[in-house]
Amino acid sequence: MAVAHTPVARTAANPYKVFIAGGCYSGLAAAINLLERCDSNAENPIPVAITIVDERDGFYHVIGSPLALADKKYAEKAWVEFKDVKILQRPDVQFLHGSVTKVDTATKTATLRESADLHERTETYDFFIGATGLRRAWPVVPQALTRKTYLIEAGRHIDAVTSSSDPVLVVGGGAVGIEMAAELKTVQPNIKVTLAHSREKLLSAEPLPDMVKDCALELTRAAGVECLMDHRLTTSKLIKNAAGQDAYEVEFENGHKMTASVVIVAISKSVPSTDFLPKEALSEEGLVNILPSLQLANKDIPNSESHFAVGDLINWSGIKRCGGAMHEGKYAGLNIHQIMQHELEGKEVKLNEIGEIPPMIGLAVGKSAVSYGPDGMNSGPQVMQVFFEEDLGFRICWDHLRLGGDPA
């Protein structure tokens, strides 16, 4: 593969500058795998300087949101400030708390707005990785941008759902709604939890066979959640219940009415967080068009081969999953290392490429889970253990990314 770079000797004073927008699963995977490869030749390591920008001040385990919004102890665990991500505490990595507002691919310059004072600054780079994911609404994910305010936000939510005699209503029977309802019921078994979905089957928006959707319903009911199918919410009005507490009078399109202590709307049209990229790089939905090598697909964009995109923001097949995001981040890191080696040593570039991703899912439902992929469907407590363990996959992801490992 031809790469349009002019070889320049690299030293500690003139390292390769890599700018990563987004510090979750895919962004951290890219950084860690790239550093590992650059350090692999102890006698002649490749000097790099990595900048990771994120709106949050830490790694937040997004998969764990349903449990983080049901259990205060777990909420403390699910958000780890970047200063406590051990493997990346090294002089060639800097974390910036802020948001990327613009990327100029021609000059290889990123503009970002710092969270502390809204000051705008620019950073130049040799390689760019977009890993900012999708913007998801509350309460699908917390909206707080610091660990401190997140714990307050999560705590208030948990207090609200645990302090009333009326049932908690979760609206939306996609993966998030199912997991939120089931986690809440499992952690707080004394609360009545109702899940309402506008369609005949749960997971109706996903390209999954009916047996998976039916199994999800069976497991949700077995977890103790009341499921209302074909119930589309029309109105939700704040009232005082019989005990004088704030509650909601809810009405559905079919005429069914109920009183709920809290209404959790788990229907979220997630929006790609890609405004900072050139329009020419994006699909109509705002996802990033990529080559299988994870580089920008549009060759008319200046320096497209130096710009990568990974994780939920890419326009690619498959259901958005953190396993895929970590894999893509790894490949982006390895591919950037390949290009560096080509520049420095003239080595032939052999880029790693992702393949088409078939529909697959792992869904936690209380103490059980259902999984589906090319090998078919499995369900039960043993699936929960394999896919999520006791903490909705926190340890699995933390250890897979090696976030607690020693920095090189």
Where are the predicted features?
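Glycine-rich Rossmann-fold phosphate-binding loop(s) that bind the pyrophosphate
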Residues: 22-25, 172-174, 318
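C-terminal, flexible cofactor-proximal segment of oxidoreductases
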Residues: 98, 319-324, 328-408
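FAD-site-proximal beta/loop scaffold in flavoenzymes
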Residues: 147-165, 257-327
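Rossmann-like NAD(P)H-binding beta-loop-alpha module
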Residues: 163-195
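FAD-binding core/adjacent interface of flavoenzyme oxidoreductases
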Residues: 2-21, 40, 90-169
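Beta1-alpha1 glycine-rich phosphate/pyrophosphate-binding loop at the start
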Residues: 3-96, 182-207
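Hydrophobic beta-strand scaffold positions of dinucleotide-using enzymes
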Residues: 20, 50, 129, 262-264
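A Rossmann-like FAD-binding core segment of flavoenzymes
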Residues: 91, 95-98, 102-109, 190-292, ...
